[in-house]
Each structure stands twice: as C-alpha cells, then as structure tokens.
C-alpha cells in the first residue's frame, strides 16, 4: 500500500477509446483506438483520437491508465457491450502510480466527418479510496478497526462497472 497524491489519483497517462455502434437497438463493438496528444492538468485531461464517421448512434467507452488490459484482450467486432465490458481488466501492476479509470458517453447523432467532435466525459476510478480520520485529544480513545474486507474473485482490476454507469 501507499499514499497517492491528489494529482496521482486523478492523473490520466493514457487512454483507449472503444467505439460501439447501435445495431437493432443495442450497442455492439466496432473498433478501438488510442488517444493521442494527451494533456493532463489537475482534474482534467484532453486528447485527440481518430474515429470513423457514422450516422448511427455510437457509444464511446474510455479506459484510462489501462495498463495491460489490452495486451491479451482485443474484443472482436460485433461483440455485445456487456461482453466487452466484462473483458476489460488489468493487473495491479502500476496501479499505485496512476489509477485505472473508466468513462463512457452515448452520442445519439453519430460521429461527423466534416467537423471536430468534442465531448466531455467524467471518468470513474476503478479503485475505491476510503479515508479514516479521528481527531485526537489528550483523553481520546484509540481508534481500532476490527476488520477490512475486500472481495475480488480474481487478480484483475475490473475497469468497467457491471451496473449502469452514471458518474
């Protein structure tokens, strides 16, 4: 364990964009591309990405600080949104430096080729943080934590949440 500064908790060092297109009322995976020219300052980051134009509604899934998540996993075009989300996971290696993050945005109008498409996406950390504070005085009782329980069925960090995402 260790302490992360506020900057380290919010820093985004790399981002992968997974593009899903609506087909028969459901989103299906099409392709992914890496964010370029990433600039991270304070609580925000800006980047550029080359995306294919489409008039169909799209959903952009963003994986920030994704580590080795795509080293052995590349979703196949046509996969469902749930399958893609379930497959995105990374090891704990490097997680103490920059926390893995996830965000998504639906773009009902699709992506236009003749103009710059700009979006603001809130990112959710894949790792929870709990701060415990106790004010101490001369007659304070000591703080004792009986137990801390964390559950993870494997050795991977799950980037995308299971339930609907609403930061």
Which residue stretches match the model-derived regions?
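Sec-type signal peptide cleavage vicinity
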Residues: 1-167
């Amino acid at each position: 364990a260790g302490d992360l500064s506020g900057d380290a908790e919010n820093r985004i060092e790399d981002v992968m964009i997974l593009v899903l297109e609506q087909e028969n009322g459901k989103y299906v995976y099409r392709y992914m591309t890496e964010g370029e020219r990433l600039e991270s300052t304070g609580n925000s980051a800006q980047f550029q990405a080359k995306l294919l134009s489409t008039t169909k509604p799209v959903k952009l899934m963003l994986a920030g600080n994704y580590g080795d998540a795509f080293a052995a996993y590349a979703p196949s075009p046509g996969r469902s949104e749930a399958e893609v989300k379930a497959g995105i996971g990374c090891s704990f290696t490097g997680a103490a430096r920059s926390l893995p993050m996830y965000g998504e945005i639906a773009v009902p109008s699709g992506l236009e080729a003749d103009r710059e498409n700009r979006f603001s996406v809130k990112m959710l950390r894949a790792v929870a943080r709990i701060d415990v504070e106790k004010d101490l005085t001369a007659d304070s009782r000591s703080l004792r934590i009986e137990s801390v329980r964390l559950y993870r069925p494997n050795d991977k960090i799950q980037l995308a949440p299971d339930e609907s995402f609403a930061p």
